[in-house]
Swiss-Prot record:
One of its GO terms (biological process) is translation. This is Large ribosomal subunit protein bL27. Belongs to the bacterial ribosomal protein bL27 family. GO terms for molecular function: structural constituent of ribosome. One of its GO terms (cellular component) is cytosolic large ribosomal subunit. It comes from the Bacteria. Keywords: Ribonucleoprotein, Ribosomal protein. The keyword Transcription does not apply. It holds the Pfam family Ribosomal_L27.
Length: 85
């Protein structure tokens, strides 16, 4: 004979896997061509000089140099560029 009443089922208990987004190379860091600088959803950061943008809005270095973050334009957008060393 059972000594506990049957436990009910739950509809919770799921969560999505983290996507590891964010800045991967910070300002002043040296990068090689092809290095990923920022992984993002949408254009939180925009591509500046010597920076390419992937189809998932990932920013990556097009040339060797140092990473530079700057705020430009009338809408105060954040740009990431690479300055030659």
């Amino acid at each position: 004979m059972a000594h506990k009443k049957a436990g009910g089922s739950t509809r919770n208990g799921r969560d999505s896997e983290s996507k590891r987004l964010g800045v991967k190379r910070f300002g002043g860091e040296s990068v090689l061509a092809g290095n990923i600088i920022v992984r993002q959803r949408g254009t939180k950061f925009h591509a500046g000089t010597n920076v390419g943008i992937g189809k998932d809005h990932t920013l990556f270095a097009l040339s060797e140099g140092k990473v530079k973050f700057e705020v430009k334009g009338p809408k105060n957008r954040k740009f990431v560029s690479i300055e030659a060393e």
